[in-house]
Amino acid sequence: ISISYTGIPESILEQVVTDSSGQTEVVELNAPPEEWSLDENEERQPYSEYTLNIEAEGFESISVSGTEILANTKAIQNIRMKQKDQSREEEQVFVIPAHTLYGNYPPKIAEEEIKPVNETGEIVLSRVVVPEYIIVHDGSPRDSTAQNYYVKYKDYIKNVASSEIYATWPADTIRANVLAIMSFTLNRVYTEWYRNKGFDFTITSSTAFDHKWIPERNIFEPISVIVDELFADYLSRPNVRQPILTQYCDGRRVSCPNWLTQWGSKSLGEQGYSPIEILRYYYGDDM
């Protein structure tokens, strides 16, 4: 595995080899000051970007461009390599776009947070089940050129949370955001929202419709640990069986009354609010 700054591929900074279990040692890389990711008015990019070139005998090479490194935070880059196919020689290249708090993405189109589920002919689960896998459509719903990916539910949540918030934020802020992401996702699963519209996927990667998921992006350890702790949970209201479609926005470029705001949840976490207190602050006391 060779590591270089994204945009300067010829300058290899580190070369590492995986051990018998397929893991590398921890590599220290430069990143901007941690404060940049804690200040919503900071215009500078709060993470550095690296390109990883991964090669193994008998497997197709993979290049990941734009792996994000935040200060004082362990980043984890999971890679699954495919065995070499003699008919194909080119390497797989994944370009990781900007983090949603830094880049420009379309804001969420508002929806009802509780879906009608008594219409005829709908397939709806009788109880809330945490799925093992979900199918992610990597584009907007009607983009038939976008690829569908089978993703483990836990890995999906870790990817979305790593794309939507910064892992440097307070742990209870991360918990509140992870709960909102999981509840939103489980609402899509429980109501079979897209399948009932004739699509063959669970959720999309478009921020206008759902939340950001990025193929092969790195995740961050503080987020990963919290998802492992909470992954069977979701948010509900009294006398409502389905998980609530907990919508949110960044709260800086986009404002969204009655939804969680990501930057606002960070300051509540800094003030000592618990995860459920953060969520009730935005979604109301019966959450």
Predicted regions and their residues:
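Short, acidic Ser/Thr/Gly-rich low-complexity loop/linker segments typical of extracellular
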Residues: 8-38
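Conserved, single-site charged/polar hotspot
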Residues: 17, 27-29, 53-67, 71-287
